[in-house]
A protein has these predicted regions:
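Alpha-helical transmembrane segments of multi-pass membrane proteins
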Residues: 83-102, 149, 153-160, 179-205, ...
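An intracellular "coupling" helix at the cytosolic face of ABC transporter transmembrane type-1 domains
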Residues: 33-34, 122-123, 139-148, 152, ...
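Hydrophobic/aromatic residues in alpha-helical transmembrane segments
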Residues: 53-57, 94, 113, 164, ...
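Helix-loop-helix
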Residues: 65-75, 168-182, 252-325, 330-331
């Protein structure tokens, strides 16, 4: 996993092209091997035609034209015409099929990245800007389009054409063939010198593109704060800095890339000139007919065109290797929480929850966040967790939902260790409402239905009524069909939380978890919500985290958490009677209300 970074920080990449990453592209070709085989068959046919055409030209010049054999000339011309038509048809088929296979591969790659990201732990998303994750799913995969759509298979065609042309050239005249290859070592040296600088340039470019994307994503998410503090100019200045970094990196990368072409083209032209010189002057004892000389020039083009094409592919490969490294780095991040090999589905539960001497720490050698937490909850009971910020309240419910695993001890539900059951079956019987409520773009009905995708409209309305969300929903322009923007920006904080609460209740979980679920709801809304919750909590084991003690006074048991330990435990009246930490917290809130 990449180290924690911000939009200003570049991510570390390999210095050299990672051949393993490039070979992994083959995994995405495998499902389409039948198509690829057909394409390769067409490629072989086209390569053979490209070799036959110069030879037929040689025969025409050396045999048909000098002897004025019109019959042979007509036959050769007709054969050339047929071969050219077949070649063009093959070219069209190859282009269309390669594009289709390439797009199918990209679709599969996007699917794998998106699916994999859904399984990654919270720590992955906490360790980097979301914009840097987004660019991997969209921009980097799109950048691979040309390489996967044409480059990979075309380079196979080019290599085959290169080899078969080389063989034919040596068969016709091995000495002239050697002269044709005389400048080839200079080409190899030119490519090797440039590839190191080009690889590094595109790594820097991908870093700067990632940083810019992360900054834009962050700026859009925080645009209200920017406008509130009138910091538009400062934001624009930072944007310009990031954008200039991208432009500078792009120009450096392109400058190096464009150095490749003049070198290849120059060596290609010099090779053809050398063939003419040797063939005409008889240098080195080479004696060839005019037809052979013309054919060799054609073969030289057949020889150098693939070399130029391979050079182009190599350019693309250098560019894409930096992006492939980022994509596969994401795919190689293993979820910290996975199903055990022998995991079984959690059966329908009653809701007994046991924390047995639980110890938790984020890092193996880090400090303990929870210390020997021992908590036993009977089915249907409501447990409230209170205490100062950072005491470990949210960590307790994260362990219950198995977003993290305990370091020592165990968490069980109806006697089943949560590590021994499948994640889907565990979380399917839980309803979790986090402090940071998320509303998806779509209408209100779809957002509530997210808790149970096959829910009827009647069930949706019933859930909304239960949490007293129905009235405000009906006051919206289109009621339940009112379209809300991403993150529910057109709704108030309280309305967003009520919709999210209805979503959780619609799932009808056996265990209900509310993490600061009413922290952004005004007192009047909270009172309406509390009235609906009183009967909905019955029959469900419920865990409630709340800073407002008024929302948990009716809890069956209240646990005061401090420094990762349960320091007080009992109901509201019992804890007040002890005049301990809970009593002091209650008194401080009551004093604030009086003021």
């Amino acid at each position: 996993m990449a180290k924690r970074n911000t939009f200003r920080e570049d991510e570390e990449l390999e210095e050299q092209i990672n051949l393993h990453d490039i070979l992994r592209i083959g995994v995405y070709l495998k499902p389409y091997k039948a198509r690829v085989i057909r394409i390769l068959a067409v490629v072989v046919m086209m390569s053979c035609i490209s070799v036959v055409v110069p030879y037929l030209t040689k025969v025409m010049i050396d045999s048909a034209i000098p002897t004025k054999n019109l019959t042979l000339l007509g036959e050769l011309t007709a054969l050339l015409a047929v071969l050219i038509v077949i070649f063009e048809l093959g070219l069209r088929y190859r282009t269309v099929e390669i594009t289709r296979v390439g797009q199918l591969m990209l679709k599969d790659m996007r699917r794998d990245i998106f699916t994999h990201i859904q399984t990654l732990p919270f720590s992955y998303f906490d360790s980097r800007p979301h914009g840097k994750i987004l660019i991997r799913v969209v921009n980097y995969v799109n950048t691979l389009s040309d390489t996967l759509s044409s480059g990979l298979i075309n380079v196979i065609s080019d290599v085959f054409t290169f080899l078969i042309t080389l063989v034919v050239m040596f068969v016709i005249d091995w000495r002239l063939a050697l002269f044709s290859l005389a400048l080839f070592p200079f080409l190899i040296a030119w490519v090797l010198v440039l590839q190191h600088f080009q690889r590094r340039a595109y790594q820097v470019l991908s870093n700067k593109q990632s940083n810019l994307n992360a900054y834009i994503h962050e700026s859009i998410a925080g645009v209200k704060t920017t406008q509130t503090f009138a910091q538009e100019a400062a934001q624009f200045k930072t944007f310009q800095e990031q954008q200039n970094d991208v432009r500078t990196s792009w120009m450096k990368a392109v400058h190096i890339q464009f150095l490749m072409w003049p070198g290849i083209q120059t060596i290609s032209v010099m090779t053809i000139a050398l063939i003419y010189f040797v063939g005409v002057t008889g240098f080195g004892g080479v004696e060839v007919s005019t037809g052979v000389l013309i054919a060799f020039v054609g073969y030289a083009n057949n020889f150098w065109n693939p070399v130029i094409s391979i050079g182009n592919f190599y350019n693309q490969l250098i560019t894409c290797s930096a992006y492939l490294e980022r994509i596969f780095e994401t795919l190689d991040v293993q979820p910290e929480i996975r199903n055990a090999p022998d995991a079984v589905d959690l059966p329908q539960i009653e809701g007994r929850v046991d924390f047995n001497d639980v110890v938790f720490r984020y890092e193996p050698d880090g400090r303990n966040i929870l210390n020997l937490v021992d908590l036993h909850v009977e089915p249907g009971k409501t447990i409230a967790l209170v205490g100062p910020t950072g005491a470990g309240k949210t960590t307790i419910i994260n362990l219950l939902s198995r977003f993290y695993d305990v370091a020592e001890g165990s968490v069980t539900i109806d006697g089943h260790d949560v590590r021994s059951v499948t994640l889907e079956s565990l979380r399917r019987q839980m309803g979790v409402m986090l402090q940071d409520t998320f509303i998806f773009s779509g209408n209100v009905r779809e957002n509530i239905r997210y808790g149970k995708l096959d829910a009827t409209d009647e069930e949706i309305v019933a859930a909304a009524k239960a949490v007293h969300a129905h009235d405000f929903i009906m006051d919206l322009p289109d009621g339940y069909d009112t379209v809300v923007e991403e993150r529910g920006s057109t709704l108030s904080a309280g309305q967003r939380q009520l919709i999210a609460f209805a979503r959780v209740l619609l799932a009808d979980p056996r265990i209900l978890i509310l993490d600061e679920a009413t922290s952004n709801i005004d007192t009047r809304t909270e009172e309406a919500l509390q009235a609906g919750l009183n009967h909905l909590l019955k029959g469900r084991t419920s865990f409630i985290i709340a800073h407002r003690l008024s929302t948990i006074e009716n809890a069956d048991e209240i646990c005061y958490i401090d420094h990762g330990q349960i320091v007080e435990q009992g109901n509201h009246a019992e804890l007040l009677a002890r005049h301990g930490a809970y009593y002091r917290l209650y008194e401080s809130q009551y004093a604030m209300i009086k003021v």
